[in-house]
């Protein structure tokens, strides 16, 4: 169940136990809300793993094991490198847990390059067209909802425009 750390504390922490597993995700490994959720989960006996970009962070030290993102120091607020690596790491983990051989993502770099090249002209046209707008809504449903939420956050952080991600 993907959940925001404060929501986990309020809604799910009272119900977890030693038969549950949690993966706690933080770019820095120092996000207070995530560390608070981790503390509650561990107090309930949950097995806790983490995914972080900073080796030796509080989060990585306090979990049973951690998945390193190794995408380098994040200098921009939107944390695009970290987010991209988090998605790829989760895809790889899901593939392996589902019985895959770990090679499912081998073609991903080429696919990403093709997608960027194919979309670049349309993205430039769209950016030019909506550049003066002040309000944006990114809508998603099901598996695309997290992308809509993250897309809205990226637009807010980079453009300072009003943008909301929401369920369609």
Regions found by a protein language model. Name each.
Residues 1-107, 141:
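Glycine-rich phosphate-binding loops that contact phosphosugars or nucleotide phosphates
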Residues 65-168:
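Active-site phosphate/pyrophosphate-binding segments
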């Amino acid at each position: 169940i993907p959940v925001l750390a404060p929501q986990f504390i309020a809604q799910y922490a009272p119900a977890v136990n030693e038969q549950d597993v949690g993966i706690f995700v933080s770019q820095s490994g120092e996000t207070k809300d995530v560390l608070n959720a981790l503390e509650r989960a561990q107090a309930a006996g949950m097995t806790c793993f983490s995914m972080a970009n900073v080796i030796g962070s509080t989060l990585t030290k306090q979990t049973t094991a951690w998945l390193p993102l190794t995408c380098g120091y994040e200098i921009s607020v939107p944390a695009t490198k970290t987010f991209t690596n988090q998605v790829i790491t989760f895809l790889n983990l899901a593939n392996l847990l589902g019985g895959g051989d770990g090679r499912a993502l081998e073609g991903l770099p080429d696919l990403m390059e093709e997608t960027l090249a194919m979309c670049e002209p349309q993205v430039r046209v769209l950016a030019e067209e909506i550049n003066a707008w002040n309000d944006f809504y990114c809508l998603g449903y099901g598996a695309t909802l997290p992308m809509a939420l993250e897309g809205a956050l990226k637009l807010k952080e980079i453009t300072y425009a009003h943008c909301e991600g929401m369920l369609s």
